[in-house]
Amino acid sequence: MKTLLTIFVLALGAVSAWANNGVVGFWTTIDDETKEAKSVVQIYEYKGKIYGRVVDVLKNKNATAKLPGSPKIIGLDIIWNLEKDGDEYNDGEILDPQKGKVYGCSIWREGENLIVRGKIAFFGRNQTWLPNKTFKGDGKPPIPNIPKH
């Protein structure tokens, strides 16, 4: 009985460690210039691919994207079609809503943080997104709605 309990506790710890290394969840983005928290993005899985949707903008809740129709940034998918590749998710795209430009995208975990890389060919840059443990969604993963760009 003691051995069975030990195996159960070890297995539970392994599953918990694996779950904490995932990318799915809520993440706080940081403004490159001011270094202040900017928005909350929900990273979610849909049909085996990873997507990211802005669920909150921390300063200007009515901010719009530089896209046809000027959609609000809140509710906008900014990451789409990422595929798992080892410990990373690659071959997707990311939208910069303020510029209306789309770049290649990869994401991966470094410790508790999420590293988001936007790139054109071999050139790119990384952003570090912080885990957001206070934002509560409705519990249902969204259905992707990739913006026209």
Language-model regions, residue ranges each:
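Surface-exposed interaction patches
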Residues: 90-93, 99-119, 124-128
